[in-house]
Amino acid sequence: MNLLNLLNPLNLFRTESKDTTPEGLTLNPEPDNPIPGHYFITERNEPIVSEIITAGNPILKAVAAPVTAFDKKLKFLILDMKKTLYEANGVGLAAPQIAVSKRIFVADDGESGFEAYINPEWQPDGDEMATDSEGCLSVPGLFGEVTRYARVIVRYQDIHGKKKVKKASGLLARCIQHETDHLNGILFIEKAISLHKGPKDEE
């Protein structure tokens, strides 16, 4: 078993008091986002698949902090999120879902391609609403009907900090709203009209 997979840099929690930081890892590198036992790999060549935390973890109920540093650590994080998203066969993934309380999500609706949304803010693009089924990688095995705006305008920053604006409709618009909810500590089950069981690996 790969040691780096065991020592997931974004989700490992350590309870012992002695310093057991593995070689090549740095403990708690970001004072503004302290997570006990949180490791960040400082030297590696490839992105990793991060563990996705599930409902009941307090990180999923917290309001995520804005991103202020557009540096190498952010690029590593985005690459990890991309690999984790595709490994899980998801449409969207928010940073809090891998225990990083930052205002970031990534998405790929199958048409627009992969995109990282940093510090996103959206607004409705019209009054039309749509109700459809949603799932969540952090709520495995449950799906629910959720009513959201059919079209949105999202403003965000890319991985270099450049400000962007995008119009979205359909699945991407739903994904943007769903993932932004994660950044505000909200799960789709809190908005669902009804819930039903289904496959455990979809979002």
Give the location of each predicted region.
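Positively charged
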Residues: N2-E203
